[in-house]
Amino acid sequence: MSAYIRDAVRTVRGKARPDGGLAALRPHELIGTLVEALDQRTDGAAHRAGGLILGTVGQVGAQGANVALVSKLHAGLPEDGFAFSLNNCCASGLTAVGQASRMVQTGGPDILAGGVEMMSRVRFMADRADYYADASFPPRTRYIPVALAADRLAEDLGVTRVELDAAALTSQQRTAAAEGTPLVASRIPVNGLDREEPARASTSAESLAALEPAFAALSDPYAEALEGRRIDHRHTVGHAPPM
């Protein structure tokens, strides 16, 4: 049996801080908004789905206790449908969609799948896992911050600072150019916010070039995980996901 994506929607992106455009809401409310939007676009198909799978990294606080189940109840999805959350770090949402696809291909029902992460509500590393800082872990199994890993990978692959700046500038330019086009047709306004709040349309090659590498201070705290390796730090806040 084949699996198909009938439709896809997402909320507009808000800044990950207490005064961000979406911060007054809760994760299950965002999912509820998307379920309603899907219903409007698919003649009620969302409420005929047999289950909901959500990928979520920070499964504590507002995103704890199986946020997929909370979202299902909030959205009024069928009582006999399943709901579960999974964590595959930054690939959680994609993993949820992949899992849904495999379930459909093996004879399962139509499924709603995606991800939710509200960093204005649940901060990065909020689960305080031992993996992040426990010195008893062998060095090769230690956590290395994503920014530090990116610097190491850029050095290993020979990605220059100029290339990083160019990629960041292209990303910002594409974001700005997409406004008002079919490229954002899947985006759902929420709470009066109808544009990507973290976007930096004023970004220029000159402003990126003026930024200093931002993550060198992470090297010493994670020296053991790096097994003594010294890294040529290249990434700046201009290359990082805007939050």
PLM features: what roles do these ranges have?
Residues 1-75, 79-85, 90, 152-161, ...:
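Conserved active-site "lid/cap" helical segment
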Residues 3-6, 109-113, 243:
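Short glycine-aspartate micro-motif
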Residues 9-12, 23-24, 29-33, 166-243:
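N-terminal extracellular/periplasmic Venus flytrap/periplasmic-binding protein-like
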Residues 11-18, 101-157:
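Glycine-rich loop/linker segments at domain edges
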Residues 25, 56-109, 127-128, 141-148, ...:
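Conserved catalytic cysteine-centered active-site region
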Residues 63-64, 122-124, 193:
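Short glycine-/acidic-enriched loop or helix-start segments at secondary-structure transitions
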Residues 87-116, 154-183:
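Active-site-proximal alpha-helical scaffold in enzymes
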